[in-house]
Amino acid sequence: MATPDVSVHMEEVVVVTTPDTAVDGSGVEEVKTVLVTTNLAPHGGDLTEDNMETENAAAAAAAAFTASSQLKEAVLVKMAEEGENLEAEIVYPITCGDSRANLIWRKFVCPGINVKCVQYDEHVISPKEFVHLAGKSTLKDWKRAIRMNGIMLRKIMDSGELDFYQHDKVCSNTCRSTKIDLSGARVSLSSPTSTEYIPLTPAAADVNGSPATITIETCEDPGDWTTTIGDDTFAFWRGLKDAGLLDEVIQEFQQELEETMKGLQQRVQDPPLQLRDAVLLNNIVQNFGMLDLVKKVLASHKCQMDRSREQYARDLAALEQQCDEHRRRAKELKHKSQHLSNVLMTLTPVPLPSPMKRPRLARATSGPAAMASQVLTQSAQIALSPGMPVSQLTSVPLGKVVSTLPSTVLGKGSPQAAPASSPASPLLGGYTVLASSGSTFPNAVEIHPDTSSLTVLSTAAMQDGSTVLKVVSPLQLLTLPGLGPTLQNVAQASPAGSTIVTMPTATATGPEEHTATIEVAAVAEDHEQK
């Protein structure tokens, strides 16, 4: 069913000023109400006045007029006198469901949806709030929900008879034409300006044999996307489908959209975002109702970020728990270490004083001068009885001088030291062995092993007057043949650091062997050298 165009022609507005006198004589504000009618049809009759009511000084006097056979519109003009100047305010009575209000045209500026321009019960609200208060919030297009004399506000504005106040000067660039151009003109999606209305030719507008005005329902904001269209719009698209042109139109749409989106995708890679790209995105979202897709992407990203934040929080809590466990473990180990240290301190014995070190043996240098000096520094000699067992030699301290003298010399009570040049006084390992001043080793030496710790290794030294016997602790008898009077500085310490005692031996000349017992004449203090 085709809907005919609405042609409205505004006639001359007549303003009549009549003074009003109060009954009680008090001065009140003069309110003048002038009824201005417009003829909506070429064959209009006289206007019939239904009713007229007077409101207070803040609101204009409203009067509703109806015509039975012809469409008429009542316009209320409120004239308020401020001093000597007169100010006219034009209001339009509007309805939404069962609710009634007045549209203040001077405040009805672009885009209008959220502008407070509707006077409802002495309150000025926005058209969107008026639709919600009327219980028509399910209608997403507020221009369809609001009517003037039973005609949708959208149809009146599409016809051009009503527009926003000073729209040519004040425009938000969010308003768009609701007409479709079927004569070949193209409108770019990136154009920020509104499209102009181009009238349809009869050939282009002829759908199913009847001329009609084709309108495309659009939205003022993303929330005004509508799923309902008029019968004429549906008939137009069905005619394109029947003519086999709908596929071609869709392909053109797809190609245009692909090129536009491809260029947009290339441009958004380089920051910052350009203004024209932002306008293009806004138009795409508004025209195609893709605000829900944007919200879906944001909600998905927010959900992902929330999951990541929760995972990071759990990982951080686990790491903090591990750190606390390591700190507690370290504290326990430190406490145990301190306890063990205290126990060890109580169990540690008092250190005993280190034993006195045994004096080192003084090594005399070889040569007659050294031996003479060693002999002359003798002091504190200790006389021993003749025939002392060899086992008692182990108790002789270090640094002593042991001399073997004949019994005739011992009887005199004073030992005679051999001259330094005599071969009978060799220096052996820190011990000086002194012999009598007689012949070289005149007496043979006989060792009696009277203890189990003394071992006689050889008795061949009895035949050689130049053999030297050494007593080493544990007591062992060693023979060193062939040394004779040239023996010097022969000393050897045992692994245990025992005392080394050396004694010269000699054998008597003659066919018979003569033996003699070692007689230790004296032990003299030796000068300690370090």
Swiss-Prot record:
Instruction: State its role.
Output: Trans-acting factor that binds to glucocorticoid modulatory elements (GME) present in the TAT (tyrosine aminotransferase) promoter and increases sensitivity to low concentrations of glucocorticoids. Also binds to the transferrin receptor promoter.
PTM annotation (Phosphoserine): residues: S373
State what protein this is by name. Glucocorticoid modulatory element-binding protein 2
Q: What is its main location?
A: nucleus
Question: Which positions bind DNA?
Answer: K136, K140, K143, R154
Molecular function GO labels: identical protein binding; metal ion binding; sequence-specific double-stranded DNA binding
**Which regions form coiled coils?**
245-270, 304-344
A Pfam family annotated for this chain is SAND
Q: Which UniProt keywords apply?
A: Coiled coil, Cytoplasm, DNA-binding, Isopeptide bond, Metal-binding, Nucleus, Phosphoprotein, Transcription, Transcription regulation, Ubl conjugation, Zinc
Localization annotation: Nucleus; Cytoplasm
Q: How does it assemble?
A: Homodimer, and heterodimer of GMEB1 and GMEB2. Interacts with the glucocorticoid receptor (NR3C1). May interact with CREB-binding protein (CBP).
Which cellular component appears as one GO term in the record? nucleoplasm
Locate the cross-link: Glycyl lysine isopeptide (Lys-Gly) (interchain with G-Cter in SUMO2): K155
Q: Which residues form the SAND domain?
A: 81-163
Source taxonomy lineage? Eukaryota, Metazoa, Chordata, Craniata, Vertebrata
Give the InterPro entries listed for this entry.
SAND-like_dom_sf, SAND_dom
Q: Which residues bind Zn(2+)?
A: C110, H167, C171, C175
Renumbered to this chain, where is the cross-link Glycyl lysine isopeptide (Lys-Gly) (interchain with G-Cter in SUMO1)?
K155
